[in-house]
Amino acid sequence: MSDIERLEQEICLALEAANDEQALEAVRIAALGKKGSISEKLKALGKMEASERQKAGPVLNGLKNRILELWAQKRDLLKRQAMDTRLSRETVDITLPVRSSPMERGRIHPISQVIEEIIAIYTKMGFSLAEGPDIETDYYNFTALNFPEGHPAREMHDTFFFDVDKIGERKLLRTHTSPVQIRTLEKQKAPIRIIIPGKTYRMDSDATHSPMFHQVEGLVIDKTSTIAHMMWLHETFCKEFFEVASVKMRFRPSFFPFTEPSMEVDIQCDRSGSEVKFGEGQDWLEILGCGMVHPHVLKNVGLDPDEYQGFAWGMGIDRIAMLKYGMPDLRAFFDADLRWLDHYGFRCFDMPAFFPNRNV
């Protein structure tokens, strides 16, 4: 065995024995560093005769290249092994229970929870979910819903308007979710049964009002629906949502441009204590507004009011959340206070009483 072969064998054994990047780098320096074994032999080429140099040069350079290649392969192997070790130490078992510290566990916001409860109740009764844009046109927000230009009912809405755009149109933030009723009626054929939860915007702010609030509206359009059906629907919803066996309701005459007749619905309750109790007591609390869809609204979407009829209603999601779960100030809903959310929020698997197997 020649000196070159013996040197290559020694270096290869040292590379194989290196078990971390620091040891591997030491082998490289010992072989190819400024005073390394291969570097010293390469320096000696200058002292050789030309004939000897022509023979030894390619051999030494070949050795250098082979050692560099083996070193790079071992370096990559050690890096992969180090990464595998790190990943195995940092693996998170997603089947483990969540941490118990209040600041480390997430909570579902009451608004999100109540929206899910509302959707669950109405979909169980055959309704589908509809959605629409928050930024609306004057036509969908007012005109199509029987609010003509200059109509005094427009004063009921303190509206956020945008600047007039390039085509002369002035967009606005929707003041109710009713525009989705028009958009749905334009696209779908009757019969229609939809609910529309979403954000709405009005210039109002106090303990019970917010410039942005959540509303759910519903719409039923067919050839046979009556006020009796509407009254049954509201009674059923209130019993399910407030989790009571029975409720007393009263329907008071009111006015909404898009319904005729229009009504406001009160639910009987007990307000004598620190919280509102439904299904008992002698007090009354307004819960929603409703009515039969106005013939002008039906005509605006191409339906014959002599053939089709239906009813619509709307209620504030924030308001009924406050009533059901005893939250006194609406403004706290939007303060991003984790302490408030930890107190009033819901765990991921919390379910209301009207769901079967709620404790599973």
UniProtKB/Swiss-Prot annotation:
Its main location: cytoplasm. GO terms for biological process: phenylalanyl-tRNA aminoacylation. GO terms for molecular function: ATP binding; magnesium ion binding; phenylalanine-tRNA ligase activity; tRNA binding. The keyword Iron does not apply. It is an enzyme of class 6 (ligase). Its EC number is 6.1.1.20. It is found in: Cytoplasm. Keywords: Aminoacyl-tRNA synthetase, ATP-binding, Cytoplasm, Ligase, Magnesium, Metal-binding, Nucleotide-binding, Protein biosynthesis. Belongs to the class-II aminoacyl-tRNA synthetase family. Phe-tRNA synthetase alpha subunit type 1 subfamily. PANTHER family: PHENYLALANINE--TRNA LIGASE, MITOCHONDRIAL, PHENYLALANYL-TRNA SYNTHETASE. This is Phenylalanine--tRNA ligase alpha subunit. It comes from Bartonella tribocorum (strain CIP 105476 / IBS 506).
